[in-house]
Structure formats: C-alpha cells, structure tokens
Amino acid sequence: MTALTHQTTSQLHTAPAQPTLSAKALLQSDDEALARMLLTHCSECANALMTSLLKGCDSEHPGVEALRALLMVACATTEQEQRRARNTLECMFILGTARWGRKARSEGVASFQLASQRWIGRLLQLPTFDPDALCALFTGQGAYTVVIPGSPYWPESLEDLDVRSDWAPPLALWVQGDATALTSCDRPVSIVGSRGVNEYGRHVARNLACQTALNGHLVVSGGAMGIDAAAHWGALEAMNQLGAKVAGRTVAIFAGGLDHCGPTTNMRLFEQICTRHARVSECTPSTIPEPRRFLLRNRLIAALAYSVVVAQARLRSGALNTAGWANEMNRRLFAVPGEITTPAHAGCNRLIADQQASLLSSTSDIEQLCHETHAPSIRP
C-alpha cells in the first residue's frame, strides 16, 4: 500500500493535461462512478453547490452530465463557446437549487461561479484525461472500491443528508475491505466518544460494540483513538467468537483519503478491519485529513446509523458534534452516564440532563438499541 500511496500522490501533481487535445475520450465516457470520483476531486468532497449542480441534471447519470458541463467550459476555444458553456452550467445550478426547494439568489449564483472556476482549475491540473488512467489513479490502482448512489452497497440512509439545502450527501464512497459491510444491517449502531478516555469508557464502548455485533448488527465509528478504537475492537472480538457468517461487521469512517488513515497507533486495528469489514471515506486518495474534515466526517457517522451512542465524552468533544448531527436527522441518540465530578463524563451527562439523549443503562441488554438479532447481509 505504501508504494500505491506515493504513486497516487505524485501522479496528482504532475504536469496537467491539455484539455482541447485530450478531453474527447472523457467527454464521451458514460462512467458514472468515474464522473463522481472526478467531481469529488474537483470540489474536495461534497458540498451544497455541487449537489445543486447534480440536481439540475436530467439524465440517468447526473455525475456524467455535470462533469461534461464543466469540461465544456474548460475546453471552450472561443469567447462565444465559453459564454454558452458557462450559461448552460449556471442554468443547471439554478434549476438544481429550485429542485432542492430554494431560489438561487444573486449571491448564490456568484458563489457557484467562483466555485465552478476552482473546480475547472482542478480538472485542468489532472495529469491525464484518459478514463482508464483516471480510474486507476482514483482507485489507488484498484486498491479501493468506489460505491456510488444506485449501487447495491450504497447506504440509503445517507440520503437523509439531502433534507436540508445547506447539507450535502457524499458524491461517492471509497471503500477498502468488504463493501457489503455498508449494507449488512438495516439499523446500524454508531458508537462515538472522546479520544482521551478512561478504562470505564473504553470498557463500555468495547463491550457495547461486542454485544451489538454478536447480534449481527453493524457497528460504525471513526477509527480514532479512545472510544472509536474500543468500539471497533469490540466488533472484531464478536467475529472471533461467532465467526464471519453470524457476527456483525464494523465500518470505520475516515476524514481524509484512505491512504491517509490514522492514527498510526491504530494501524494493526485498520489491518484487521480490512479483512472482513470496511474502511470508508468520502474523500479521494491523497486527501489530507484537515481538522474541518473531521466535523464533516461526523455527519456520515450519524447518517449511517439508526442509533447513535456517545460512550464517553468531555464537554468539548467532537463526539458532541456527531450527537448534534444525530438529533438533526432524527436518529435515536443515547449517552452513557458517568461520574459528575469527572470532566471526562461531562459531555454525556450534559446530553442526558438537557434531554438531548436517552440514558443508556446497560451494555449487555441492547434491546433498546437494536432490532431483532439477524445474520449480516453479506456476500459469500
């Protein structure tokens, strides 16, 4: 994987392709997955402006149509062609905004114009416009599976991120491991919390995740130290006990490209997850996990879940951001109570006191969290 990582990163920074000479094959491509990979690269993950553009497309392959519209602007050789292509692009955005339930005001159109210029600039910096080469580049030479809307492995719950026009669902998901883990359970449980935890929090997260997976349910978390790692290890423990046919899976959601998974102290965990579970990101390979991306990642952890559990959290923990997303999307939110004299539990205690979350009173009796026991829906 190290060699693939370096190769992918370096290729993205080589000399740009010449659009008017080499974009023809890409313009003719009807590969929706490739189009969404490139649109994700252009917009640096999902945002509301790109989603409006996609909603303004009328074809069965909105990603392909949106990419072609951007390429037509990039390839225009005369002022008239440029004006016509930009007008088409803006009309798609305005239509998509209306379909999303809003009116495209002048400031919104201006924001789209600036954003689309950046997107086109990133397209022009691609090292090639050859579809096969781009597909190899953006899948880490085949190391990652790309899942898009319409795929049998696309979690339908992500569409709840579409209910407000200032949110945006991911354009695609990059998966390393078993992509079927994403849809292996109808009502997944997300377990989140602080990185710096005590033994109580670690025990609660691991035991709760193990019990959840022992009943065939999917456990979702963020791959970080502390509560996240404990939750993933708990799900792995369940598989060691019951085997792959019965135990539920675990999915780790990352804030950057899958070639930038961290922390390094969790590498053994990540290797285990890749066997029969899944590492997932909405970002293209080589994307650096900047601080703002962790907050965006939290919305995916909440959206994937039927129930969200905050196992242990301080008042300023990022897990409270995930809890906020969960409440916005009407997920069932639970918090584990702790000592009122310990700052490590203050976030959970506040959620319970403010009636933002239900109190979770047991890690062994999970009936209040999960539906009936089932075998995971996975490929043979």
Spans of features found by a protein language model:
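Glycine-biased, small-residue-rich flexible motifs in mid-sequence functional cores and linkers
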Residues: 1-36, 41-44, 132, 141, ...
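Short, small/acidic-rich helices and loops at N termini and domain boundaries
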Residues: 1-151
